[in-house]
């Protein structure tokens, strides 16, 4: 799973993946994404998660990832949104978290942390279940052609 800022750096600006792969080589990446409209809204102002959980984070859209590989020899071979399944994972994490609050408190976490973490897990679950937030598994392949 990639850090929110990592795809553009790994795939485009730094050229690290393009340089590391041989022609025909494949690279797989799992990354949380947003539809283009939500991506643009994130860029204009911080949402709750950007403020409290991942300060400065910016999840890309699939189009942003595609643009980041435009001047490389990388080709997008597959992109699957597994967000609906990830929503179920988040629900299980939240239920497990709530079932173990005594252990959480015993580790020194206060009620503010507990409320924030429960809200974060529920917010993410809802986002993935509705498609507002996506979780893409992407496969890229290094082509044999010349970059334009």
Name each model feature, range by range.
Residues 1-9:
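A short SAM/SAH-binding and catalytic strip from SAM-dependent methyltransferases
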Residues 9-10, 89:
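Residues at alpha-helix caps and immediate loop-helix transition turns in enzyme cores, especially N-
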Residues 11-26:
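A short glycine-rich, Lys/Arg-flanked "PGG" loop and its adjoining helix->strand segment in the class I
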Residues 30:
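Alpha/beta-hydrolase-fold catalytic nucleophile elbow
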Residues 33-148:
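Substrate-binding/catalytic lobe of Class I Rossmann-like enzymes that use SAM or dcSAM, i.e.
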């Amino acid at each position: 799973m990639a850090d929110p800022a990592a795809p553009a750096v790994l795939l485009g600006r730094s050229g690290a993946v393009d340089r590391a792969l041989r022609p025909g080589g494949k690279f797989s990446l799992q990354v949380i994404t947003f539809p283009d409209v939500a991506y643009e809204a994130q860029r204009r102002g911080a949402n709750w998660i950007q403020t409290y959980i991942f300060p400065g984070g910016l999840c890309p859209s699939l189009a942003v990832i595609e643009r980041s590989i435009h001047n490389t020899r990388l080709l997008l071979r597959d992109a699957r949104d597994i967000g609906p399944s990830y929503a179920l994972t988040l629900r299980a994490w939240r239920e497990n978290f709530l079932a173990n609050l005594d252990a959480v408190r015993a580790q020194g976490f206060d009620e503010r942390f507990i409320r924030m973490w429960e809200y974060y897990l529920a917010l993410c679950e809802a986002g993935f279940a509705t498609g507002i937030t996506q979780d893409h598994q992407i496969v890229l392949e290094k082509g044999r052609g010349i970059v334009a």
